[in-house]
Amino acid sequence: MPLPDLSTLSADQPVLIAGPTASGKSALALRIAERQGGVIVNADALQVHHAWRVLTARPSPQDEARAPHRLYGHVARGTPHSVGHWLREVTPLLSGQRPIIVGGTGLFFTALTQGLSEIPEVPAEVRARADALREGDFARMQADLGARDPETSARIDMANPMRVQRAWEVLETTGRPLARWQADTPPPLLPRSRAARFVLEAPKDWLAPRIARRFRQMLDQGALDEARAALPHWDAAAPWARAIGAPELIAHLRGEITLDAAEEAATRATRQYAKRQRTWFRARMRDWTPVPPGSA
């Protein structure tokens, strides 16, 4: 398949590239940067973590030498990082050399191009209570939110535990409905109309063997060594521990499963993650330019 037509892009037009894991996003970003110039900026919540270069498929040192890269591997283990942190980090990069923003975290792109509500962070104590209530009595959480915040309840999928918990946490933390916070969303940093927007298509039958092949390559390139270095600090609930494949490799290092079983489980988890990404992109990026499989 051909590369997307670059002749329609001006050299200073921001570029956004989204797509599921293992679909070739980074390769496409690098080709555009080498042909037209620009700074490649990470928009993947997993690739910000310093602990995982191989396991999150961050660009290699060789690729980083071919074009400037920003916001990769800059977050230390245990350091909080959210979409709000990312927006603050990306802001100065929008006014310098043309940014080529690439990643698989749909929320980053939505916040960048549509704005982000300035909702205070949920305290750990509230999050713990919310987790316990959702897991122990989700019906009670639904009823409580419905009674105290009918405005938000009418707008969200009340059968979705994560959506309900988020709205409940915001109400508990701020005393204000999530719907009202969202209504006060500030203007976006980069309106969609200003950027060239590409989303990589990755049908599951095409992507599945790529995922399996890539995880095998990760093992060959040192993913197990990364997990071994992380083992003394392991906290399964920590954001940095959410790297796909990390829990499985840690389980192997602890003697709980074989390496073959870890590889199979990690590959399966990656396929499931890619499915969630495809669902997000189909729902929210219908006006983005599709890039056929293999174009990158």
UniProtKB/Swiss-Prot annotation:
PANTHER family: TRNA DIMETHYLALLYLTRANSFERASE. The gene is miaA. ATP binds at G19, P20, T21, A22, S23, G24, K25, S26. The keyword Nucleotide-binding applies. Its cofactor is Mg(2+). Monomer. Keywords: ATP-binding, Magnesium, Nucleotide-binding, Transferase, tRNA processing. SUPFAM superfamilies: P-loop containing nucleoside triphosphate hydrolases. Catalyzes the transfer of a dimethylallyl group onto the adenine at position 37 in tRNAs that read codons beginning with uridine, leading to the formation of N6-(dimethylallyl)adenosine (i(6)A). Its EC number is 2.5.1.75. This is tRNA dimethylallyltransferase. Belongs to the IPP transferase family. The record marks T105, R127 as: Interaction with substrate tRNA. It comes from the Bacteria.
